C-alpha cells in the first residue's frame, strides 16, 4: 500500500515528471522546455505511483499536464494528486514559511485505450470569477485551445465531481438507478490510499491523537489538554497542523459536495484528502475545482456557486425565519447539492462562537461549526457512493430535527453496508452526531441523580474544570477532523456507534444522554481518584498528580487500547460500585431445601447486580426411586433468571456445573430446547456444564480404539462419598473402588458421550471443562477440596465453598491497536497490559459485593482476568493467516508477554508497598514457581525477565493470585470494531435483527481487499456469490490460488477446528485461568452432523491438556439457513465484556 511520503523525503513517492525523476529539475524548468510556462515551480505526482506517469502536454502556452497510467481503472477518481510547490510539499510547511496561493487541480478528460488512459490536469492559482463567486476568487483563464479543443464531457459525475474510471458496468439499482452506466466509486477505487480507515494506516491513530487539534479556540491544543503517551517509532512526523482549520475568513464548505478539493481524492473521506498535505491557515485558498473544470472545458454553468463571499438575504443568525429564507434563496440548488444549507449553518455557528462567552461546565450544549462539518463530510461521502441523499432540511440546525434527519439517513442506508466499508464508517459517524444532539451540559451531568456520580470524583472534576473544558473542545474538534487521522473514535463503524448509543451511554433527565467523552471522563476520573501512590509511580515513573493519572487512563480508554468489562464501563465512577463480572458459587447443599435457600438468597443477590454465575450443584445428588431430583430446583433457578432478565437492559445468566457420574446428568442434558420432554423439566434460561474427570476420556478413548463393553458408572450421594473433592489419581482410585464394590448404575460410555454431543449440537450446551487439568495447574494443592466448577463463560478458575464464593474482575487489551505498519508492537502491548492491571486492581479495591461470601472471595485472592480482543483482526492487518507458522509463533509470543507484563505489574505494586494477596504464602508463587513451568512443552523467550521476576516475587510477593483469562468479548469488541476475544471471525457479515430492523456488521478488511482485487461487474458478482455462501470466501471463491491475499479471510467455520484447539493449547502455559473456546462445526451436505465429529474434537482438546474443552458449540447449517448456536434469547453480558 502506498503511504504518504515520509517527512524526511517529501519527493520519495513521486512519479517521474516530464521524463525526469520528481526529485530532479523543477517542473518549472521542464514546463518551460515544453512551452508550458507556470507561475510557480510545481511537481505533480500520484500518491499511488503504480505505473502513473505525469507528462507535459507540450502545448505552447498550456498550463496542463497529462496523466498516463496503465492501471488507470484502479486509480480513477481516487487518484490523490499532490502538488509540490511553494506552499504544499510532501508534508505541511513550517508555520513560519512564506505563503503563496495554492494551486488547484481538476481532471478534465479521460481517454480510454488498451494501453492506458490519459487525463488532462489543469493548474491555476485561483479560478476566474463565475456567477455567485466573490471577487476574491478570480484568476486567469486556462485557455481551452491549450487543451486541444473542448474535450468530451466526463463519463459520469458524482455529486458535481468527475470520475476518471473507464469501467462501463451497469450500476446496481440500489445505488442509483438501473440505467446508470457505472457503479459507486467505492467499487472502482483502490482504497489503499484514499480511505481514511485503511487497514494499514489506522494504527497511527494513537500517535496522531496528540497532534490532531492544534487550532481549538483559545489556542488550546490536544497536547495541552492530554499529552500522548505513545512513543512508537512509527509516529507521524509533521511540521504543521494535520488539517487546515476553518478560520474566520475561510468558508468551511469551499468545495461543493461530491467535488474533489485541492489536492483531494474524489473518493476519499473528506473534502480535503487525509493523506494530502494542505496549506496553513491564512495561506491563499485553493480554488473550487468545479470552476476549474468549467474553465478547462469551456462550459458555462448558470447555477450560482456559493462560496465564502455569498451574500445571504438574512443575517448570520440561526432562527426558523432566517433558515426558511435561505432555503427559498437557494431554491432547487439544495436538491442537486443536499448539503448546501450546511454552509449557512456553519457560518452562523462561527458567528455565534464569537458572541458566546468562554465554555464552562454550565455552558449549554450547542451544535457547532465542527458538528455541521461532520455532517457535511458524511453527506459528501455518501454522494460519492452514488447514493440519493435527501437535502438537509432548513430546521436541521435544531438538535431534534437534526436527529430526525440523521435517523432517516441511517435507517435508509444501513442495509447497503454489506457492499461498502466506507458507508459502514460513515453511518457510524452519523450515529455519533445523533448522540451529540442529546448531550447535556457538564453541570447537568454532574448533578444528575440517574448518573449518580461518585462524590469524590465530582469534586475532582470541578477542581479541574478548565483542563477538562479544553480537553472536551480539543476532542470535539479532533473527532470532527476525521480526515486528519486514519481512524478516530467516531469512525469505528456503525455497530460501534450503535453499541455506545443503545447500551453503554447512560440516560438521564428524561431525554439526555451521557456523551462518549463524559463516559470516559467518568471512568478515567474515578480510576485516577482511587489510584494509590504505588500505582502512580508505576504508571508515570513518579508520584504524579490526579490530572496526570487521569490522562494516563483516559488516553488508553478513549483510544480503545484497553477495554473494561461491561459492569465496569457501566458503573465505574458512579455510586453503584458493583464492577465484578464473574461469580462462582458452591453452596455444597445436599438437600432440596438447602439448594432452594442458596438459590433464592445467594444466587438471587448476585443476579440482582447483573453478575454472571457458575453454580455447582454436584453435592445435591439424591435422584433415585422415591427420592428428589435436582431438576425442580433448577426449574426455580430458570424462572429466577428469566424474571431478572425481563426488566434488565443488561441480561445475564447462570450455568450449573455437575460431574458426569451425577445421577441427574442425563436429565440435565435434556433440559433445553427440543430435547426437553415435559414442561416441568424445561430450563431454557440457564446453561449446563460438565466437569469432566480424566477417567471419563481415558475410557472413551478405549471405546474409540475399538474396545468393547466400555462402561461408565453413575453414583448418587449415598454411594459417591467424596468423589467431588478429589482429582487425578486419588479420584480414579476412589471411583474404581466404588465400582468394584458394586455401587452405582453402569451404562455404556458411548451412550453418555452421544447424549453430550447431541445436546451440544442441538442446544449449544453443555459446556465441557476438564476437572483434573483445572486442579492440576492451580496455584496451590486442592486435593481433598477440589475446585468444582467455573463461571458462566468457562474461562475463570477459582475455588469456591459454602463460606467463600469465587469472584473475578475483568478487563481486556485490544490487540488490533498493537499493530503498527504491519508489525506487532510488543512495547504497546506491555503498556496496555500494565494499564489494564492497574485498572482492575482499582476495581478490586473499590467494588462492592452482593454477598458476604463474595466479599471474602474477592478480598482473599484478588483474582483478575486480563483478556484479549481483536486477535484475528490483528492477524489480518499483519497480512497473516491463522494457519501460518508466523502467526502460530506470534500467538505464543503474545500470550507470554501478557502474563509476564501482568505479573511484573502485580509484583511492582508489592515492591511499592502493597500487601500480597492473603493466600500468597500457601501458593506456588512463594516457592518461585510459575504456571507455565508445569507445561513440558513451554519454551519462554524471556527467560531473563522471568528469572528476575522470580527473585522479586519470592521477596516481595504478588498483589494478585491470577492474571490472564481469555473470555469472549462480544460486547466490547463491537465498540472497538474488532474480532471477539481470541476467536476467528464468526462470519464476514454479521447480521443482528432487532425491533429497529436489521443491522449489518461487515468485515471491512475483507471489503477493502475485494475492492483491490476486483472491479466492475466482476466485483458485484463476487459479492453476490459471497451472499449466497454466507460470506465464506473459501466457499464463494474456491478457485483462488493458495497464496492469494483473499485466502486469509476465513471464518471460524472454515478453519480446521483442531487447529483452533492447538492454538489454544499453545497459549495455555501462559493462561493461568482458562479460555472460552467455542467449537464451530458444519453439517454435511445431507444435513447431518456425525456425533463422532464433536467427540473427536473433545478428545483432541483433552489430549492437548486444555482446561476448557468446549464453551459453545455452533453449527453451520448445510441448507444456508444460518448458524445455530443454542438459545439466542440468553446473552451473557458479564464476562462477555
Swiss-Prot record:
Biased composition (Basic and acidic residues): 291-304
EC id: 1.17.4.1
Location of the motif RIP homotypic interaction motif (RHIM): 64-84
Top-level taxon in the UniProt lineage: Viruses
Pfam families assigned to the protein according to its UniProt record, in alphabetical order: Ribonuc_red_lgC, Ribonuc_red_lgN
EC main group: oxidoreductase
GO biological process: deoxyribonucleotide biosynthetic process; DNA replication; release from viral latency; symbiont-mediated suppression of host apoptosis
Positions of substrate binding: 566, 581-582, 612, 791-795, 968-972
Site description Interacts with thioredoxin/glutaredoxin, residues in chain: 1132, 1135
Compositional bias of kind Acidic residues: 196-206
Keywords recorded for this protein, A-Z: ATP-binding, Disulfide bond, DNA replication, Early protein, Host-virus interaction, Inhibition of host caspases by virus, Modulation of host cell apoptosis by virus, Nucleotide-binding, Oxidoreductase, Viral latency, Viral reactivation from latency
Ranges annotated as biased composition (Low complexity): 281-290
Catalytic function, reaction form: a 2'-deoxyribonucleoside 5'-diphosphate + [thioredoxin]-disulfide + H2O = a ribonucleoside 5'-diphosphate + [thioredoxin]-dithiol
Entry annotated with the keyword Translocase: no
HAMAP family: HSV_RIR1
Subunit structure: Heterotetramer composed of a homodimer of the large subunit (R1) and a homodimer of the small subunit (R2). Larger multisubunit protein complex are also active, composed of (R1)n(R2)n. Self-assembles (via RIP homotypic interaction motif/RHIM) into homomeric fibrillar amyloid structures. Interacts (via RHIM) with human RIPK1 (via RHIM). Interacts (via RHIM) with human RIPK3 (via RHIM); the interaction leads to heteromeric amyloid assemblies. Interacts (via RHIM) with human ZBP1 (via RHIM); the interaction leads to heteromeric amyloid assemblies. Interacts (via C-terminus) with host CASP8.
Annotated family: Belongs to the ribonucleoside diphosphate reductase large chain family.
Domain notes: The RIP homotypic interaction motif/RHIM drives self-assembly into homomeric amyloid structures and mediates interaction with the RHIM motif of host proteins RIPK3 and ZBP1 to form heteromeric amyloid structures.
UniProt-recorded name of the protein: Ribonucleoside-diphosphate reductase large subunit
Origin species: Human herpesvirus 1 (strain 17) (HHV-1)
Lineage: Viruses, Duplodnaviria, Heunggongvirae, Peploviricota, Herviviricetes
Amino acid at each position: 500500500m502506498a503511504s504518504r511520503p515520509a517527512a524526511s523525503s517529501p519527493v520519495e513517492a513521486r512519479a517521474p515528471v516530464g521524463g525526469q525523476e520528481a526529485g530532479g529539475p523543477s517542473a518549472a524548468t521542464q514546463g518551460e522546455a515544453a512551452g508550458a510556462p507556470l507561475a510557480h515551480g510545481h511537481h505533480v505526482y500520484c500518491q499511488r505511483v503504480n505505473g502513473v506517469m505525469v507528462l507535459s502536454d507540450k502545448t505552447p502556452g498550456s498550463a496542463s499536464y497529462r496523466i498516463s497510467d496503465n492501471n488507470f481503472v484502479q486509480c480513477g477518481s481516487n487518484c490523490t494528486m499532490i502538488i509540490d510547490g511553494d506552499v504544499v510539499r510532501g508534508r505541511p510547511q513550517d508555520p513560519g514559511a512564506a505563503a503563496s496561493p495554492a494551486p488547484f487541480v481538476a481532471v478534465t478528460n479521460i481517454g480510454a485505450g488498451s494501453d492506458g488512459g490519459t487525463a488532462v490536469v489543469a493548474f491555476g492559482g485561483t479560478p476566474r470569477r463565475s456567477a455567485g463567486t466573490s471577487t476574491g476568487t478570480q484568476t486567469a483563464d486556462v485557455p481551452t485551445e491549450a487543451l486541444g479543443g473542448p474535450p468530451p464531457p466526463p463519463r459520469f459525475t458524482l455529486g458535481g465531481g468527475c470520475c476518471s474510471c473507464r469501467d462501463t458496468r451497469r450500476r446496481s439499482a440500489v445505488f442509483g438507478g438501473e440505467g446508470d452506466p457505472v457503479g459507486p466509486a467505492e467499487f472502482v477505487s483502490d482504497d489503499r490510499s484514499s480511505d481514511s480507515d485503511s487497514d494499514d494506516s489506522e494504527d497511527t491513530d494513537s500517535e496522531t491523537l496528540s497532534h490532531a487539534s492544534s487550532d481549538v479556540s483559545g489556542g488550546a491544543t490536544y497536547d495541552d489538554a492530554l499529552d500522548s503517551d505513545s512513543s512508537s517509532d512509527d509516529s507521524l512526523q509533521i511540521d504543521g497542523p494535520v488539517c487546515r482549520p476553518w478560520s474566520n475568513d475561510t468558508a468551511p464548505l469551499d468545495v461543493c459536495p461530491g467535488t474533489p478539493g485541492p489536492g483531494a481524492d474524489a473518493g476519499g473521506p473528506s473534502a480535503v484528502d487525509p493523506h494530502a498535505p494542505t496549506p496553513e491557515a491564512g495561506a491563499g485558498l485553493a480554488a473550487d475545482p468545479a470552476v476549474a473544470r468549467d474553465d478547462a472545458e469551456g462550459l458555462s454553468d448558470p447555477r450560482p456557486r456559493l462560496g465564502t463571499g455569498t451574500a445571504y438575504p438574512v443575517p448570520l443568525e440561526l432562527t426558523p425565519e432566517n433558515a426558511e429564507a435561505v432555503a427559498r434563496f437557494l431554491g432547487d440548488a439544495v436538491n442537486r447539492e443536499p448539503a448546501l444549507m450546511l454552509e449557512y449553518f456553519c457560518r452562523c455557528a462561527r458567528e455565534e462562537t464569537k458572541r458566546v462567552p468562554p465554555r464552562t461546565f454550565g455552558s449549554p450544549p450547542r451544535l457547532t461549526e465542527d458538528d455541521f462539518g461532520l455532517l457535511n463530510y458524511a453527506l459528501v461521502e455518501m454522494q460519492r457512493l452514488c447514493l440519493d441523499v435527501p437535502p438537509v432540511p432548513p430546521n436541521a440546525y435544531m438538535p431534534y430535527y437534526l436527529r430526525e434527519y440523521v435517523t432517516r439517513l441511517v435507517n435508509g442506508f444501513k442495509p447497503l453496508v454489506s457492499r461498502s466499508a466506507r458507508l459502514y464508517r460513515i453511518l457510524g459517524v452519523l450515529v455519533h452526531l445523533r448522540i451529540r444532539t442529546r448531550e447535556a451540559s457538564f453541570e447537568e451531568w454532574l448533578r444528575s441523580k440517574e448518573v449518580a456520580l461518585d462524590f469524590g470524583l465530582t469534586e475532582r472534576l470541578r477542581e479541574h474544570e478548565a483542563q477538562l473544558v479544553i480537553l472536551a473542545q480539543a476532542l470535539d474538534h479532533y473527532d470532527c477532523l476525521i480526515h486528519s487521522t486514519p481512524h478516530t473514535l467516531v469512525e469505528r463503524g456503525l455497530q460501534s456507534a450503535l453499541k455506545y448509543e443503545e447500551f453503554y451511554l447512560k440516560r438521564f433527565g428524561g431525554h439526555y444522554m451521557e456523551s462518549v467523552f463524559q463516559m470516559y471522563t467518568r471512568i478515567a476520573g474515578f480510576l485516577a481518584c482511587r489510584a494509590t501512590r504505588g500505582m502512580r509511580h508505576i504508571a508515570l515513573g513518579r508520584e504524579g498528580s490526579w490530572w496526570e493519572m487521569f490522562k494516563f487512563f483516559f488516553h488508553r480508554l478513549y483510544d480503545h487500547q484497553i477495554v473494561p468489562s461491561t459492569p465496569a464501563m457501566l458503573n465505574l465512577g458512579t455510586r453503584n460500585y458493583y464492577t465484578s463480572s464473574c461469580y462462582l458459587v458452591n453452596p455444597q447443599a445436599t438437600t432440596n431445601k438447602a439448594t432452594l435457600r442458596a438459590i433464592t438468597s445467594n444466587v438471587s443477590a448476585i443476579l440482582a447486580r447483573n453478575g454472571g454465575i457458575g453454580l455447582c450443584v454436584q453435592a445435591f445428588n439424591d435422584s433415585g426411586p422415591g427420592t428428589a431430583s435436582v431438576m425442580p430446583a433448577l426449574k426455580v433457578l430458570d424462572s429466577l433468571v428469566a424474571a431478572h432478565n425481563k426488566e434488565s437492559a443488561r441480561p445475564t445468566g447462570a450455568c450449573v456445573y455437575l460431574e458426569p457420574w451425577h445421577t441427574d446428568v442425563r436429565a440435565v442434558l435434556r433440559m433445553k430446547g427440543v430435547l426437553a420432554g415435559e414442561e416441568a423439566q424445561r430450563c431454557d434460561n440457564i446453561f449446563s456444564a460438565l466437569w469432566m474427570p480424566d477417567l471419563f476420556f481415558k475410557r472413551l478413548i478405549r471405546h474409540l480404539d475399538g474396545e468393547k463393553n466400555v462402561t461408565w458408572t453413575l453414583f448418587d450421594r449415598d454411594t459417591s462419598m467424596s468423589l467431588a473433592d478429589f482429582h487425578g489419581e486419588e479420584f480414579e482410585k476412589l471411583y474404581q473402588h466404588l465400582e468394584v464394590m458394586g455401587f452405582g448404575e453402569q451404562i455404556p460410555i458411548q451412550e453418555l458421550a452421544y447424549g453430550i454431543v447431541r445436546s451440544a449440537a442441538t442446544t449449544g450446551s453443555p459446556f465441557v471443562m476438564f476437572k483434573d487439568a483445572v486442579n492440576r495447574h492451580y496455584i496451590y494443592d486442592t486435593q481433598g477440596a477440589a475446585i468444582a466448577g467455573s463461571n458462566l463463560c468457562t474461562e475463570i478458575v477459582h475455588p469456591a465453598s459454602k463460606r467463600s464464593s469465587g469472584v473475578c474482575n475483568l478487563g481486556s487489551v485490544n490487540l488490533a491497536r498493537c499493530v503498527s505498519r504491519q508489525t506487532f508492537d510488543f512495547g504497546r502491548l506491555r503498556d496496555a497490559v500494565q494499564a489494564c492491571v492497574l485498572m482492575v486492581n482499582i476495581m478490586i479495591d473499590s467494588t462492592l459485593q452482593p454477598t458476604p461470601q463474595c466479599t471474602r472471595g474477592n478480598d482473599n485472592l484478588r483474582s483478575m482476568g486480563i483478556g484479549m480482543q481483536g486477535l484475528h483482526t490483528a492477524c489480518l492487518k499483519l497480512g497473516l493467516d491463522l494457519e501460518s507458522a508466523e502467526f502460530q509463533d506470534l500467538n505464543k509470543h503474545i500470550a507470554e508477554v501478557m502474563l509476564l507484563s501482568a505479573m511484573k505489574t502485580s509484583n511492582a505494586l508489592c515492591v511499592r508497598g502493597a500487601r500480597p494477596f492473603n493466600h500468597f504464602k500457601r501458593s506456588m508463587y512463594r516457592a518461585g514457581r510459575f504456571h507455565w513451568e508445569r507445561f513440558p512443552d513451554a519454551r519462554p523467550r524471556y527467560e531473563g525477565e522471568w528469572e528476575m521476576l522470580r527473585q522479586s516475587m519470592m521477596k516481595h510477593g504478588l498483589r494478585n493470585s491470577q492474571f490472564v483469562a481469555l473470555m469472549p468479548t462480544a460486547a466490547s469488541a463491537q465498540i472497538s470494531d474488532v474480532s471477539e476475544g481470541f476467536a476467528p471471525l464468526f462470519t464476514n457479515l454479521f447480521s443482528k435483527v432487532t425491533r429497529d430492523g436489521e443491522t449489518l456488521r461487515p468485515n471491512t478488511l475483507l471489503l477493502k481487499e475485494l475492492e483491490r482485487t476486483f472491479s466492475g461487474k466482476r466485483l458485484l458478482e463476487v459479492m453476490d456469490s459471497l451472499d449466497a455462501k454466507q460470506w465464506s470466501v473459501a466457499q464463494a471463491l474456491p478457485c483462488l490460488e493458495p497464496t492469494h491475499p483473499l485466502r486469509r479471510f476465513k471464518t471460524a467455520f472454515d478453519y480446521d477446528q483442531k487447529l483452533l484447539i492447538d492454538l489454544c493449547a499453545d497459549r495455555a502455559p501462559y493462561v493461568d485461568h482458562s479460555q472460552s473456546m467455542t467449537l464451530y462445526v458444519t453439517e454435511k451436505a445431507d444435513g447431518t452432523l456425525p456425533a463422532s465429529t464433536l467427540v473427536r474434537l473433545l478428545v483432541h482438546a483433552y489430549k492437548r491438556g486444555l482446561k476448557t474443552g468446549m464453551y459453545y458449540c455452533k453449527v453451520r447449517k448445510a441448507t444456508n439457513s444460518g448458524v445455530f448456536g443454542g438459545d439466542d434469547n440468553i446473552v451473557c453480558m458479564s464476562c462477555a465484556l
